[in-house]
Amino acid sequence: MAGHEVQYGKHRTRRSFSRIKEVLDLPNLIEIQTDSFKDFLDTGLKEVFEDVLPISNFTDTMELEFVGYELKEPKYTLEEARAHDAHYSAPIFVTFRLINKETGEIKTQEVFFGDFPLMTEMGTFIINGAERIIVSQLVRSPGVYFNDKVDKNGKIGYGSTVIPNRGAWLELETDSKDIAYTRIDRTRKIPFTTLVRALGFSGDDEIIDIFGDSELVRNTIEKDIHKNPNDSRTDEALKEIYERLRPGEPKTADSSRSLLIARFFDARRYDLAAVGRYKINKKLNVKTRLLNQVIAENLVDPETGEILVEAGTEMTRSVIDSIADYLDGDLNKIVYTPNEYAVLTEPVVLQKFKVMAPNDPDRTVTVIGNASPDDKVRHLTPADILAEMSYFLNLAEGLGKVDDIDHLGNRRIRAVGELLANQFRIGLARMERNVRERMSVQDNEVLTPQQIINIRPVTAAIKEFFGSSQLSQFMDQHNPLSELSHKRRLSALGPGGLTRDRAGYEVRDVHYTHYGRMCPIETPEGPNIGLINNLSSYGHLNKYGFIQTPYRKVDRETGKVTNEIEWLTADEEDEFTVAQANSKLNEDGSFAEEIVMGRHQGNNQEFPASSVEYMDVSPKQVVAVATACIPFLENDDSNRALMGANMQRQAVPLIDPKAPFVGTGMEYQAAHDSGAAIIAQHNGKVVYSDADKIEVRREDGSLDVYHVTKFRRSNSGTAYNQRTLVRVGDSVEKGDFIADGPSMEKGEMALGQNPVVAYMTWEGYNFEDAVIMSERLVKDDVYTSVHLEEFESETRDTKLGPEEITREIPNVGEDALKDLDEMGIIRIGAEVKEGDILVGKVTPKGEKDLSAEERLLHAIFGDKSREVRDTSLRVPHGGDGVVCDVKIFTRANGDELQSGVNMLVRVYIAQKRKIKVGDKMAGRHGNKGVVSRIVPVEDMPYLPDGTPVDIMLNPLGVPSRMNIGQVMELHLGMAARNLGIHIATPVFDGATSDDLWETVKEAGMDSDAKTVLYDGRTGEPFDNRVSVGVMYMIKLHHMVDDKLHARSVGPYSTITQQPLGGKAQFGGQRFGEMEVWALEAYGASNVLQEILTYKSDDVTGRLKAYEAITKGKPIPKPGVPESFRVLVKELQSLGLDMRVLDKDDKEVDLRDLDEGEDDDVMHVDDLEKAREKQALEAAEFANSDEK
């Protein structure tokens, strides 16, 4: 027997074909959401308050300080928030301290700071009763970036940009004349030496001393001449910079100093964030820049006088490691003191080394480091600017390397917590201005924190973010896998990110650093391809928001692969050689072969085993969760795998789902972490279990009660239904499944069913990927799903009086009211069809002025005789089903309703949808198709033992699409069915073709895994042997019931007067330009005329036609289409004298055309005839006169 048994949870065992030992369990798959939000509550929120506060007034006599905050108990529980359309949120109270600096008086007060939405355990938020998700954003990391560009003459130039988290950009660039310029905040460029002089290093010799002598520096100094001898060089430079930043304003050196300080050196206006400081220190650090360069001077320890490194030594990694203390310490730092006119006069600390120029060994190049300022320095320093300029100048000398902006070392993730913190900061900054004004205006003696704080800007910012941000999305709740994928989604779009139109090919492409971090396969098809990605299965964020992936460490001394795990970011991984997870190992953990396949800086090649430093943890670390659920992924073309991964997320939860016979072992983990199942929180014993609740007695004696959700409507209109798995007396452990969620079976993801599938044609019905299906799948409810639709009706106060929900509806027979209760609301359990009343409602009609008698009748008999019209809620087209729930909200019950609404009734209707012709089906390999025919069981082809086939697929769908995985799954699935087992074949480590044939043989199948099939209609065998097996097939959310649509009389667009489009608007089918040509080609002029008039925008004509049809009269001639009037007006707007004439040659106003009963507009030919007739009549008249 090939393979080995693996237990998944308590309810399922699978035979696994994996050969690679798993050394690391998958992390919790939604930790990217939950951990980030927890960090935000623990530290992020506090940091935001500390960033913005304290706030002082303009005279600096009062100060408002932040003390702390506290989240109180949520107003509603999760279920209540869902039921009441409310937020699941907790009130937040912040303690402030107001200090009067003149009197020394201190007032401390707790201020209510609004309700803050809380994250549920599943990583979602409940906003207005619906589950939403905040998608993590993939953005460029703050830091310093260097790039090169080739001009039209083939000359290479260099550029550099410092990108902050917020604040002005600082750019450097070279031009074709080899002069280096700088730009501040995207303004006009100035020679870079101007900025150096403004920093207080004004002499030409001083600049050459700092940066070393190079052609670029000399050329730039020549360009940067001293124009005004009355100013010092620094003052002149400051004025020049001011003129660029504020053109047209009077320039002074002082105003320029304060402007530059505000732009770059003020922590409140310029923020690199922790990640920006880390990236800058890493890039400008001398250790990485000296690596593999030849040092041009002796490195001497100033304390002992010992020569650490002699001139001419190549600085290999081992040499640098040996003098790491010297390079990191203060011994090699040089202090430069700016002149007294500088922007900042504090001394500037740098590190400075001379190395041989790589391009010219006779010259030396100066390398300047920024001496790594502390992590807490979140703004730029003069040392950063000088070190950046040094790196930039070094690039022209062949030293250093340019950055790849698509490298995941340069892109980071902003998860929920950070996005919320940014939003909160925006709100607090708006509040700050408000507070400052109130502090200054009001009387200091009586002020309290409560009086000067207005929380509206903060609550508005949070509300806006959750309600309308591009990253706050309605949760994709088709099935647990789609929930999980949505929570792990990474979007490059959104505020501060890319836009679809601007994103080029490079950003969307797969990059070698995606390995183990972002899935190369799961991304949408269409305009968002490559911009929306998914986190790989083992991906994890570090504190800076870079994605890390785990590797097994290789012991360099013994050469053995250890079980020690290290998490590496993309730029850390670049320094190492990593072996693949499927490299063969000996028992002791050493590599079995001298040469192993590995990766180094994006090169996949063979490496000597001795040079390998890390090894992949698992073969599935490359791909995302949905992709890891595709068996035999390694045998599928990547384009089809992409469709397979995406279509699994569109699977509809079935009534009785089955886990796949051929799985990947990922189904258990995906179901466990999705949040759709009920998982035991503690060890214990089940003491009560039914369909509504499960009670577990813990070991310490306390009782856990779990509520089972039955038939709740999900975001996508499917039934969210949980099924109890445990019985009284079962013992459960923490983390066990105690109830399955939707699309789960025995604690495993179960998106579809395991039908018997044959690859064969049948009467041409599976042309173009269509699917032929047996009626058994309809009768036995194999692919039946339950869908819930929500309808609501509300009563409002109108000008004529309040609307009323009642059973007494005018002109409606008793038969239509049979299922309504005494209030006029449908009973639960009623079967309803299109047009049935769900909620009886009447609205007052406008009343004419009543006579005295009528007023008397009203006074005697009350309001009953008043005129009302029927505005009941009825079942729309395609909405038939069973009423499964009714919710009533009224003011009297304390429900919060919109203003003007007195009562709100919600009715939920459940539909059981069997599979039918036109529904879309798919396998897991991107093999999708539409059901074209449902064949009676007796007509389906059958196997030699009499089993009829369930589904027939077209064999032509396989070769050109290169998704051979489906054929392997088919054979292995049949073997699993015959053996009565479930199989796991993990991605990139699954069943080989030998394993497959061995299992087929064990199952007693033929050696080619094909079989003879018999035609169900004739009983004759088919000519050739057919591949028949079991394939996992899912029913997708694109169902024909939702798409079928017909229009009679419907709404028209106000402007064009043409019917609207689309099912949602009850629109028509567009009859476009090409369709008009088709009818013209057939000469079907009358059909075409009515399509372009009555059925489109002939406003009067269509009314008359409707009237004629209803009264049984002949349909009158069509009138003038609205579009003709538009055409006339457009021609007139071009200055053409366009008029419409009647038969008497009189001009007709287009508006009058529809007034008369008979149209006066004539055809051109008729006009000619009329003129001739007129001429004849005139001649006759003249003759008669003469007579």
From Swiss-Prot:
Domain of life: Bacteria
GO cellular component: DNA-directed RNA polymerase complex
EC number(s) recorded for this UniProt protein: 2.7.7.6
Catalytic activity: RNA(n) + a ribonucleoside 5'-triphosphate = RNA(n+1) + diphosphate
InterPro entries reported for this sequence: DNA-dir_RNA_pol_bsu_external_1, DNA-dir_RNA_pol_su2, DNA-dir_RNAP_su2_dom, DNA-dir_RNAP_su2_hyb_sf, RNA_pol_bsu_bac, RNA_pol_bsu_CS, RNA_pol_bsu_protrusion, RNA_pol_Rpb2_2
Example of a GO biological process term: DNA-templated transcription
Record's keyword terms, sorted: DNA-directed RNA polymerase, Nucleotidyltransferase, Transcription, Transferase
Residues in coiled coil: none
Signal sequence, renumbered to the chain: none
Enzyme class at the top of the EC tree: transferase
Pfam families per the UniProt record, alphabetical: RNA_pol_Rpb2_1, RNA_pol_Rpb2_2, RNA_pol_Rpb2_3, RNA_pol_Rpb2_45, RNA_pol_Rpb2_6, RNA_pol_Rpb2_7
GO MF assignments: DNA binding; DNA-directed RNA polymerase activity; ribonucleoside binding
Quaternary structure note: The RNAP catalytic core consists of 2 alpha, 1 beta, 1 beta' and 1 omega subunit. When a sigma factor is associated with the core the holoenzyme is formed, which can initiate transcription.
Family: Belongs to the RNA polymerase beta chain family.
Function: DNA-dependent RNA polymerase catalyzes the transcription of DNA into RNA using the four ribonucleoside triphosphates as substrates.
Protein name as annotated: DNA-directed RNA polymerase subunit beta
Source species: Streptococcus mutans serotype c (strain ATCC 700610 / UA159)
